């Protein structure tokens, strides 16, 4: 006769407590000594209760860069949740749950268990859900005997809630901006900054440090490590966002590289490292998490909502604004990252369009094929995007919509130029123009790109090639910018 659910769980937990006791009785146990016990217990529970493909991964701590100790997968490439463990003698989980470390984890990871291997606290969306003690850890430590098993049914309820968790589909811009911002903040402060500090001290691979040196040597020679951590974290998040707008139904870290356009060489190189090579484990974990968030997001619906909620006609830049306000409002204010009001942009661009007609003999204004434009400090391409809209509007008004494809291919793509120094707005700008052109029925081919280049217009010399990562791509971008 098969065991009931409760009897089976009792069997699993009895074996689990026995394994914990063996570790304790050896007398030399560290926190990591107990990891295999909880991994086996959770996987046994999952197998017995309808979560057959679930897998518990122990996250290595090669550096101080901080993710929780375990990650749980649903067996279908999606993340179920995370687990942070403390030694059994740490009996005050309530005080631990209010520590700075746990606050960061609770803010970043939506389904989290805190445990000392005997007591388990479940947090979802940062809020305490329930806590269950299955045995007394102090009795196990002091008596050297396995303590009595308790609260089996309550523990079953806790684990069932944990394993049943799945991220809801995100359909509104504010929720997505918040979900991405808190993870990007964690990526910047708890992963990239710490990994860079570790790489400076050790003789290891120093991959992130070499990326930093590339940007400092070839683009921004006063770039600090803190600024690079911010630049790199934002670039990763927006790069994943770009890839998601181009992806099919499936989406994960390994697929990001596939969906970055070949013409964006710098971004492509960054994600070759992330998707196809061996990034630091802590970094890979966070990228998996961000990819999981975007997998559960209807990107096109969110971008469309910016049009319908009175946000104006530029959904990409408004998403950028919303993200920055969630990510780091002080940084946004310090850098002056505020978009020029759209009525002002329209007035300036349409005034230029009118002057081209009235004073320079260009009958089609910005749509005239011998007109070239350049924005040397383009930001997120607010002005070039408006110029494109005006040119298409002029062309459609005179010649109909049938030849707009030709206008884009033979005038806008070769004659509209922009240069930007910072990687995040550069990435957002490319996304914006791709979206704008698609709205007019033009999909960029793999060989095409809008002529927005990453370069320093105040130091226009093409940087010398070096062996540093992405040096070739940065040098190529700067050379193309210099030709303009």
Please state what every model-predicted region is.
Residues 27-35, 230, 234, 309-312, ...:
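Alpha-helix N-cap/helix-initiation sites
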Residues 12-19, 329, 408-412:
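Surface-exposed beta-strand-to-loop junctions
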Residues 294-303, 373, 477-484:
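Carboxylate/His-rich catalytic cores and anion/metal-binding grooves
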Residues 50-77:
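Active-site metal-binding core of divalent-cation-utilizing nuclease and nuclease-like domains
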Residues 68-69, 73-289, 335-338, 344-480:
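Charged, often flexible domain-edge or linker segments that flank or initiate folded functional domains
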Residues 267-333:
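Non-catalytic substrate-recognition/targeting regions of SAM-dependent transferases
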Residues 19-25, 329-337:
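Short hinge/gating elements
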Residues 1-59:
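Charged, often low-complexity linker/regulatory segments
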């Amino acid at each position: 006769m098969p065991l009931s659910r409760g009897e089976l769980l009792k069997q699993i937990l009895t074996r689990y407590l026995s394994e914990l006791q063996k570790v304790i009785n050896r007398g030399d146990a560290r926190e990591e000594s107990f990891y295999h016990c909880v991994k086996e217990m959770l996987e046994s529970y999952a197998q017995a209760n309808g979560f057959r493909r679930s897998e518990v991964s122990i996250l290595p701590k090669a550096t101080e860069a901080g993710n929780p100790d375990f990650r749980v997968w649903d067996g279908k490439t999606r993340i179920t949740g995370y687990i942070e463990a403390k030694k059994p003698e740490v009996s005050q989980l309530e005080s631990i749950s209010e520590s700075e470390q746990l606050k960061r984890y609770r803010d970043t990871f939506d389904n989290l268990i805190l445990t000392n291997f005997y007591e388990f606290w479940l947090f979802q969306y940062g809020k305490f859900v329930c806590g269950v003690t299955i045995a007394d850890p102090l009795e196990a430590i002091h008596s050297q005997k396995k303590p009595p098993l308790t609260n089996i049914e309550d523990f079953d309820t806790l684990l069932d809630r944990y394993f049943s968790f799945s991220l809801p589909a995100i359909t509104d811009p504010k929720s997505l901006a918040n979900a991405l911002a808190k993870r990007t903040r964690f990526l910047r402060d708890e992963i990239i900054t710490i990994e860079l500090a570790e790489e400076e001290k050790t003789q290891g691979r120093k991959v992130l440090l070499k990326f930093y040196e590339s940007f400092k040597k070839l683009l921004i020679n006063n770039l600090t490590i803190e600024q690079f951590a911010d630049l790199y974290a934002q670039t990763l998040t927006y790069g994943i966002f770009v890839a998601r707008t181009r992806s099919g139904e499936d989406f994960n870290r390994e697929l990001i590289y596939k969906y970055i356009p070949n013409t964006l060489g710098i971004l492509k190189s960054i994600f070759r490292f992330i998707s196809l090579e061996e990034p630091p484990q802590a970094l890979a974990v966070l990228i998996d998490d961000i990819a999981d968030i975007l997998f559960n997001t209807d990107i096109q619906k969110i971008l469309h909502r910016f049009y319908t909620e009175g946000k104006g006609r530029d959904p990409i830049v408004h998403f950028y604004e919303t993200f920055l306000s969630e990510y780091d409002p002080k940084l946004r204010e310090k850098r002056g990252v505020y978009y020029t009001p759209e009525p002002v942009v329209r007035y300036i661009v349409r005034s230029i369009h009118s002057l081209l007609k009235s004073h320079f003999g260009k009958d089609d204004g910005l749509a005239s094929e011998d007109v070239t434009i350049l924005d040397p400090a383009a930001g997120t391409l607010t002005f070039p995007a408006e110029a494109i809209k005006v040119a298409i509007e002029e062309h459609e008004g005179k010649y109909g919509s049938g030849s707009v494809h030709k206008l884009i291919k033979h005038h806008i793509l070769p004659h509209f130029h922009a240069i930007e120094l910072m990687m995040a707005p550069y990435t957002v700008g490319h996304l914006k123009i791709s979206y704008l052109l698609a709205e007019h029925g033009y999909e960029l081919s793999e060989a095409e790109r809008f002529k927005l280049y990453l370069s320093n217009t105040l130091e226009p010399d093409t940087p010398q090639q070096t062996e540093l990562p992405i040096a070739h791509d940065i040098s190529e971008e700067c050379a193309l910018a210099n030709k303009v």
